[in-house]
Amino acid sequence: ISSSIFHLQTLITMSHFTKIKTKLYDRATIEKSLSDLNIEWESDLKKIKGYNNQEHEAEIIIRQKNNHDIGFKWNGTEYELVTDLMFWDQSHSVNKFLNSINQRYAFNLIAKVSEEQSFQYVEAKNQQDGSIKLLLRKFN
C-alpha cells in the first residue's frame, strides 16, 4: 500500500486555519488508524484553537502540547485535516504525518473490506520502498 495513492490539496481560509483535503471518509477507520500509530485522539464534535484564540469545529481531535490542536472535520464528502500550521507541533512534517495516516488508513480499510468479502488476513510485509504488501486468503 503506497501512500502516494492519496492526493492532498491545501485550501487556505481567511483565518489562520488550513484545511487539507484528504480521501479519508470512514470515521471508524480513521480512528483505528490513529490508534494503530499511537496517536492519541478524542471523538465528538469539539472546537480546536488556532492563532489569536480563533476556533474551528472538528469531529476527531488530536491535542497538541501547545494547545493549538489538529482536527479532522467532515465536509459532506470526506474528512479534511484542519489546523493552524503556524502552531504545528508534531515530530514530523504535515506531509509525513498525513502520509503515515493515509497508509495506515488504506491498510485498515483494505483489511475491513476484504473481511466483509470473505477474505482472511494472512500477513503484511513492509517493503523497502515504504509500501506494505498484504497477503489475503479467500476462505469458504
Task: Go through the PLM ranges and name each one.
Residues 10-140:
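Interaction-mediating elements
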